[in-house]
């Protein structure tokens, strides 16, 4: 026999770069999920990536690093709230990878193996409960009084959200006299589906942003910095476990099973789900799983699976923990719900900032408890990657039970002649050119002043304080003006009359007169403010000032060639092309001319001579409160002397101008060795260059 047959080569090590990339991706997605409450991928995909990393590290323990996502529980605490170190870590529960009912049998088999039970041994007793889709919470009571509520955070350190949690009616603020002197109750803060729908109706009525799902709404309420706002959000709570508790030898409770613990929670005044059940062995676990799956869509709250726990606390202690999770519990998720449907059309929608998004219009299909008729294709690259075409039969998944997506196309069912989707090169709303800039994935409409899809955003941007400044013209008033068809295009602002304004909801004559006076006042502006107010992509305040200084007049800016634009200080190819594209659209030029005809005016002068300014090439950052001038005034002085004002400190920063309560920007400047000036130092610098 050959040597190679006797000693087969070991399988190759995984690519370290792939392992590192997997960790980075998991960290990033965990941050979006736990900290920002804005998940970027479906739960199922995160679980798949996590399980891949777990498998690699199990095969190759030498690749485990202290910062691996497998070595900790979840996200990290937000900085806005005080940090709380948990007396007993809030560990997460392992997810069963088999999302069929057989996954319950897998868990029972694993438990029996861990406990060394043979086939003749009695069935293991379990507690089974729904896996609530909310926010994990730790409630700490001392001498029967709620003294602290904290989120899971990273399992070791969470966020102190006591004031907000006190507003939840289901959570007792005082416990009965027989409750332990130290008691930490763990459970889930969630929002009922009917409460979620009512909340979104209220948000729509106020013209405010609606919430994506009950979990995000609940998490957002708990993390509100203003408890008064949190109190207006209808939150609920289910208790399912304990943290730190007065020990038995010090007079604390003595439980033999997890189920007894849950019954005690009820007697102390905590809500425990009526769906919690006892199960003997694998067969009853499977029956419980199937029963909850059937009830899922009819439940008044969202769940995404069930949780099984060994009932005996003695057996729990015997089984113990592994790394980040208990061996005696598992989360058994439901399968991602998928259905077949047909693509009826592919529409391109235009967002309020001009972004074009392809959307598959679907034959109605019931997925994940809702009827789905649309699925985003995100952008041209994604649409091409999936190659979705009109008439295709596709698999649609309500991924993570939240976001409908087209998973794949059944190519064998594709009809002959189905044409490939291409993004339009004109805006489907206004007909202006749609442009995809180098390095970007999105197409954007260039008719920002004319496009009805961008109308509200264009008006708000034009009227803001840093542009022409129309005092009192806020989002709610703009909503009324646009939705009521009072304003079609930007110049219509200056055609408003008292009668039209006074007829709006909650608009008295005096308020209407104030708006008209503010509009009249805004007509006297400056060229930099006007240019900034046009909302040209990539043209901020500093760029607008450079354009005005360089060309002197609006007509010169509008007619400048790419080559001429590139001669302006701090303007590169992307900004130059953005300017040229904007002013090449006849719609945009027409709006500009109408604004001038309505009386919007400014002083113009000759182009600035090409001479170096005193602070040319120097970058400033202003932080804190200055004694005798506002930050805007300091910014104007610096820019008038040719300096540039940035929003963040970097190695390229020349000076940081620091007032009182300067904060992190001053700290970073000191770390980087950037020169720091106070107001007197800034004045001295400006005087020295005047």
Swiss-Prot record:
One of its GO terms (biological process) is DNA replication. It catalyses: NAD(+) + (deoxyribonucleotide)n-3'-hydroxyl + 5'-phospho-(deoxyribonucleotide)m = (deoxyribonucleotide)n+m + AMP + beta-nicotinamide D-nucleotide. Its EC number is 6.5.1.2. One of its GO terms (molecular function) is metal ion binding. Gene3D superfamilies: 5' to 3' exonuclease, C-terminal subdomain, 6.20.10.30, BRCT domain, DNA ligase/mRNA capping enzyme, Helix hairpin bin, Nucleic acid-binding proteins. Signal peptide: none annotated. HAMAP family: DNA_ligase_A. PANTHER family: CHROMOSOME TRANSMISSION FIDELITY FACTOR 18, REPLICATION FACTOR C SUBUNIT 1. Belongs to the NAD-dependent DNA ligase family. LigA subfamily. This is DNA ligase.
């Amino acid at each position: 026999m050959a040597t190679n047959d006797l000693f087969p080569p070991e399988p190759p090590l995984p690519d370290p770069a792939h392992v590192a990339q997997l960790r980075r991706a998991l960290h990033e997605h965990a941050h979006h999920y736990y900290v920002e409450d804005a998940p970027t991928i479906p739960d199922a995909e995160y679980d798949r990536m996590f399980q891949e990393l777990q498998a690699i590290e199990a095969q190759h323990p030498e690749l485990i690093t202290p910062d691996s996502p497998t070595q900790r529980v979840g996200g990290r605490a937000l900085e806005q709230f005080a940090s709380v170190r948990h007396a007993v870590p809030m560990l997460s529960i392992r997810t069963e990878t088999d999302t069929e009912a057989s996954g319950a049998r897998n868990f029972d088999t694993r438990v029996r193996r861990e406990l060394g039970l043979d086939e003749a041994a009695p069935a293991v007793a379990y507690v089974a409960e729904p896996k609530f889709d909310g926010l994990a919470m730790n409630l700490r009571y001392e001498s029967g009084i709620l003294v602290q509520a904290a989120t899971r955070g990273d399992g070791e350190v969470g966020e102190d959200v006591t004031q907000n949690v006190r507003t939840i009616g289901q959570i007792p603020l005082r416990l009965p006299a027989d409750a332990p002197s130290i008691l930490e109750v763990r459970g889930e803060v969630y929002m009922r589906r009917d409460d979620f729908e009512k909340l979104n109706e209220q948000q729509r009525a106020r013209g405010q942003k609606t919430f994506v799902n009950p979990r995000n709404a609940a998490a957002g309420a708990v993390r509100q910095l203003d408890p008064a706002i949190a109190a207006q959000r209808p939150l609920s709570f289910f208790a399912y476990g304990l943290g730190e508790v007065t020990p038995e030898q010090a007079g604390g409770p003595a439980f033999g099973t997890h189920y007894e613990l849950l019954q005690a929670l009820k007697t102390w005044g905590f809500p425990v789900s009526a769906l919690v059940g006892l199960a003997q062995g694998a067969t009853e676990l499977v029956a419980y799983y199937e029963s909850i799956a059937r009830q899922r869509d009819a439940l008044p709250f969202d769940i995404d699976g069930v949780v099984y726990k060994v009932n005996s606390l003695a057996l729990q202690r015997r089984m113990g923990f592994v790394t980040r999770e208990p061996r005696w519990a598992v989360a058994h998720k439901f399968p991602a719900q998928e259905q077949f449907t047909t693509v009826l059309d592919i529409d391109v929608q235009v967002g309020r900032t001009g972004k074009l998004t392809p959307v598959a219009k679907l034959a109605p299909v019931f997925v994940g408890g809702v009827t789905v008729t649309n699925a985003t294709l995100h952008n041209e690259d994604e649409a091409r990657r999936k190659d979705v075409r009109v008439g295709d039969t596709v698999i649609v998944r309500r991924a993570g039970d939240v976001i409908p997506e087209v998973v794949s196309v059944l190519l064998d069912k594709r009809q002959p002649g189905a044409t490939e989707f291409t993004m339009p090169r004109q805006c489907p709303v206004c007909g202006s050119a749609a442009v995809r800039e180098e390095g970007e994935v999105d197409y954007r409409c260039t008719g920002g002043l004319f496009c009805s899809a961008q109308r509200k955003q264009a008006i708000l941007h034009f009227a803001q304080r840093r542009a022409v400044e129309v005092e009192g013209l806020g989002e709610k008033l703009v909503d009324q003006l646009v939705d009521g068809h009072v304003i079609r295009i930007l110049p219509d602002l200056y055609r408003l009359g008292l009668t039209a304004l006074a007829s709006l909801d909650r608009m008295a004559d005096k308020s209407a007169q104030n708006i008209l006076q503010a509009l009249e006042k805004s007509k006297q502006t400056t060229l930099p403010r006007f240019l900034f107010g046009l909302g040209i992509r990539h043209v901020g305040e500093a760029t607008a000032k450079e354009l005005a200084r360089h060309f002197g007049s609006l007509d010169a800016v509008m007619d400048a060639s790419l080559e001429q634009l590139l001669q302006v200080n701090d303007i590169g190819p992307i900004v130059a092309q953005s300017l040229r594209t904007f002013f090449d659209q006849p719609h945009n030029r027409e709006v500009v001319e109408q604004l001038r005809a309505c009386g919007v005016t400014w002083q113009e002068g000759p182009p600035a001579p090409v001479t170096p300014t005193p602070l040319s090439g120097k970058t400033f950052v202003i932080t804190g409160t200055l004694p005798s001038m506002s930050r805007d005034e300091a910014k104007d002085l610096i820019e008038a002397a040719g300096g540039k004002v940035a929003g963040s400190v970097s190695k390229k920063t020349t000076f940081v101008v620091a007032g009182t309560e300067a904060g992190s920007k001053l700290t970073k400047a000191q770390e980087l060795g950037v020169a720091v000036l106070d107001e007197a130092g800034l004045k001295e610098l400006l005087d020295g260059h005047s």
